[in-house]
């Protein structure tokens, strides 16, 4: 009953000072919504396991080499690990790549994501089908034309409960549907929720490959997930797998030398993305912590003002025998109620924001919407974290005001205060304002650094011109073309597109720049080069035609480009970039020089040198790169590029029509090079948006905190201000005095924030592009922004009191 009486009394006090209460709850709701969103993202990316039974028993298995921090596993090694380990009940495998194909069922067709998996994929994960069955043991040993549908795709097909036994057709390959996964199963990787799974034994057939890649030990294509036996720890499993790695290295030194198995806890992130996700989450949580810190400082300042307004009540209670512990408890109850109100509002705001975030589906140019399966919605972990946050915030915001307001020298501390800067309470209030301003400055500096990084990325010399380039991408093999038919299709596609009015140039390539992968990695040795005398160099490459360079505006620096004479049976020639020429033939003319491709023991001759560019990622360092002729290196997947005389989107339909005339059944996607290059900036822009949101929150909190501090400090000095006016001081003089004192506090906070910003910049600079250790332009812009906010806030807060009747101020002070 005593506690309930205290709660009712605190609620009456907060209701009486409703303006202060509203500002405090608003500040905490904003900050705690940021905390809820930040922790939910962290929880979804790194804490929440796959939605399968006993997920803690699952570990992801990959390999490393001296030159690769992450690598897949070939099929023979997978079988060896699966059959010879002693720590796993079973081990599954799946290719890291997932692909899009039209899936035809009952005369209706829709593009879907499809993926090959080992026959034990669903059994290892513990996934029971909603209908039918999954794959059976032995399906990997012989091609088995079966398919398992995802719940969402089954719903799109009409949700037929008797669908098991019926067929779907993918690129003229018929598969029998054997089952449907439950709704709760969303795959093993966020961005790769397949619509259809088929056995690994069918992969070569599905891709119309003459040779099964599983027989090639150089194809490290697979990821593995193992389920630990009961009682087995991860260190024990790692030791067992690394022992098997040594056995494989001894048996197959050509492909497995120095290749070591590694394991990590299975999450919904690709293994090679976990470290980046941890860094991004750490930065996000650090920003959230700063925003919360600013909000706590703001509310603590407001509670100091509330304690000042309650000074007579607290004096009377102390005089009547209330202990200091009782006074502190009641003041902490006030702050806890404010934190609870802010926490409730913050949780609702976070829930609404996370609901929208869960529905977010990024669009990949040329391929459509990426079906992310990240569930950001709060779960029990987020709810517990938010409840703990309410308790911590209540303690953090109420402890300092409680200790101060219940001090033994209460009468001197709480009565008759005039000068803001000259009292103990004024110093505490100023310190809290400095903290808010410093935190806001640090967060705004972070926003500025992200903006500077994005501007630098947008100004990067890509090495090619993306403007006015329309493109089509198609898989000739998936469209039913043999290699001979595909080779004859190359010139037909070029000729058809070249006849379109407004098309200036047509080029072809097997991959796009900035695609996130290296096309083909070639192991080469250059005769006479120290760089490759001990170990072959790994050089990325792409196959292009003779018009590729002119279509994309890539400058020719030396030699020639490919010609019609460079046919399939002619000596293999390559064009290299400038960095490769400088690295392997320094001070020499590389034209006519030869190198040996170890992958196929093939001798190649350099015939031309072109300018450097960006090949895999927009923020990558300069790298050697080489080009093969499409006539000499056939590729089924090609990109047809057209340099147009205007907006390239207007040429996509004519290009599509031209190809449809060649083959009405041809399946392809359309996109523009500008859209593609802009997509490479998607993540930096998303990071900028997120940091800007938090920066805006910190700025609002700092402005609200500064307004409240000035408003309440001036209200406490109304007697002094009234006397000054009565003695002849003009309102302008009072304004200058208040502004001067406010600017001293703000300037100190900005200086502290800039110092913190320099430290933060050093910590995150590796995640930014082209950002100097100290970006003075960013720091100056933030300082000016904070200065402008100080002037406006101080004027708005002090104006009502400066216009008050001085005699009334003296009489009622």
Model regions and ranges:
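Short, strongly hydrophobic transmembrane alpha-helices
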Residues: 17-45, 294-297, 339-344, 429-453, ...
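Interfacial "coupling" helices/loops that link adjacent transmembrane helices in transporter permeases
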Residues: 295-339, 409, 705-746, 750, ...
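A hydrophobic alpha-helix feature that marks transmembrane segments and, especially
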Residues: 286-315, 327, 391-403, 448, ...
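Small-residue-rich transmembrane alpha-helices
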Residues: 38-41, 262, 300, 336-410, ...
């Amino acid at each position: 009953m005593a506690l309930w009486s205290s709660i009712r009394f605190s609620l009456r006090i907060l209701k009486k000072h409703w303006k202060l209460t509203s500002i405090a709850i608003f500040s905490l709701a904003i900050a705690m919504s940021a905390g809820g969103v930040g922790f939910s993202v962290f929880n979804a990316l790194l804490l929440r396991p796959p939605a399968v039974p006993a997920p803690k028993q699952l570990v992801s298995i990959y390999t490393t080499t001296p030159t690769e921090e992450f690598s897949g596993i070939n099929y023979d090694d997978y079988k060896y690990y699966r059959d010879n380990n002693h720590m796993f009940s079973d081990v599954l495998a799946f290719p890291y790549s997932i692909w899009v194909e039209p899936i035809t069922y009952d005369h209706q067709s829709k593009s879907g994501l499809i993926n090959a998996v080992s026959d034990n994929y669903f059994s290892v994960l513990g996934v029971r089908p909603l209908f039918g069955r999954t794959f059976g043991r032995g399906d990997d040993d012989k091609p088995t034309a079966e398919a398992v549908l995802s719940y969402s795709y089954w719903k799109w097909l009409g949700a037929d409960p008797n669908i098991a036994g019926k067929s779907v057709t993918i690129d003229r390959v018929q598969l029998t549907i054997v089952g449907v996964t439950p709704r709760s199963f969303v795959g093993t990787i966020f961005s790769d929720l397949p619509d259809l799974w088929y056995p690994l034994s069918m992969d070569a057939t599905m891709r119309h490959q003459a040779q099964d890649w599983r027989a090639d030990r150089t194809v490290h294509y697979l990821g593995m997930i193992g389920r630990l036996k009961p009682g087995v720890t991860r260190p024990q499993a790692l030791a067992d797998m690394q022992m098997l790695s040594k056995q494989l290295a001894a048996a197959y030194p050509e492909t497995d030398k120095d290749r070591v198995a590694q394991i990590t806890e299975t999450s919904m992130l690709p293994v090679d993305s976990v470290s980046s996700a941890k860094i991004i989450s750490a930065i996000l949580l650090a920003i959230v912590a700063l925003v919360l810190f600013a909000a706590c400082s703001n509310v603590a300042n407001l509670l100091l003002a509330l304690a000042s307004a309650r000074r007579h009540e607290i004096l009377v209670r102390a005089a009547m025998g209330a202990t200091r512990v009782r006074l502190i408890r009641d003041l902490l109850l006030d702050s806890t109620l404010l934190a609870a109100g802010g926490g409730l509002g913050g949780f609702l705001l976070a829930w609404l924001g996370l609901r929208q975030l869960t529905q977010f589906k990024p669009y990949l140019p040329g391929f459509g919407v990426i079906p992310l399966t990240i569930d950001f919605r709060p779960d029990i972990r987020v709810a517990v974290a938010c409840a703990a946050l309410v308790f911590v915030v209540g303690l953090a915001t109420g402890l300092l005001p409680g200790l101060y307001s219940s001090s033994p020298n209460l009468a001197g501390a709480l009565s008759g205060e005039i000068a803001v800067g000259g009292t103990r309470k004024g110093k505490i209030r100023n310190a809290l304002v400095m903290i808010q301003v410093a935190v806001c400055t640090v967060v705004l500096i972070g926003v500025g650094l992200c903006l500077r990084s994005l501007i630098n990325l947008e100004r990067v010399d890509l090495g090619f011109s993306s403007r006015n380039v329309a493109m089509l991408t198609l898989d000739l093999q998936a469209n039913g073309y043999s290699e001979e038919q595909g080779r004859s299709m190359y010139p037909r596609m070029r000729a058809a597109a070249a006849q379109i009015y407004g098309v200036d140039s047509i080029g072809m390539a097997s991959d796009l720049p900035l695609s996130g992968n290296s096309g083909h990695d070639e192991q080469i040795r250059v005769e006479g080069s120290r760089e490759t005398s001990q170990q072959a160099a790994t050089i990325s490459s792409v196959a292009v035609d003779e018009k590729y360079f002119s279509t994309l505006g890539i400058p020719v620096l030396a030699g020639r480009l490919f010609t019609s004479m460079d046919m399939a049976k002619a000596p293999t020639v390559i064009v290299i970039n400038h960095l490769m020429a400088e690295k392997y033939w320094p001070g020499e003319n590389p034209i006519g020089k030869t190198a040996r491709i170890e992958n196929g023991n093939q001798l190649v001759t350099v015939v031309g040198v072109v300018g450097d560019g960006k090949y895999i990622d927009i923020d990558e360092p300069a790298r050697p790169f080489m080009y093969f002729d499409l006539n000499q290196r056939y590729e089924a997947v090609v990109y047809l590029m057209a340099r147009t005389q205007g907006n390239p989107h207007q040429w996509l339909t004519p290009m599509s029509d031209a190809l449809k005339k060649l083959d009405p059944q041809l399946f392809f996607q359309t996109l523009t090079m500008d859209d593609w290059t802009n997509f490479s900036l998607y993540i930096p822009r998303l990071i900028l948006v997120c940091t800007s949101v938090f920066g805006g929150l910190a700025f609002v909190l700092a402005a609200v905190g500064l307004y409240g501090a000035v408003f309440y400090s001036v209200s406490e000095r109304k007697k002094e201000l009234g006397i000054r006016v009565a003695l002849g001081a003009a309102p302008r003089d009072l304004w200058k005095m208040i502004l001067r004192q406010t600017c001293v506090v703000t300037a100190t906070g900005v200086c502290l924030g800039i110092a913190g910003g320099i430290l933060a910049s050093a910590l995150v600079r590796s995640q930014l592009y082209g950002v100097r250790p100290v970006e003075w332009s960013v720091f100056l812009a933030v300082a000016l922004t904070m200065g402008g906010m100080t002037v406006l806030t101080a004027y708005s807060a002090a104006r009502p009191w400066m216009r008050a009747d001085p005699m009334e101020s003296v009489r009622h002070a």
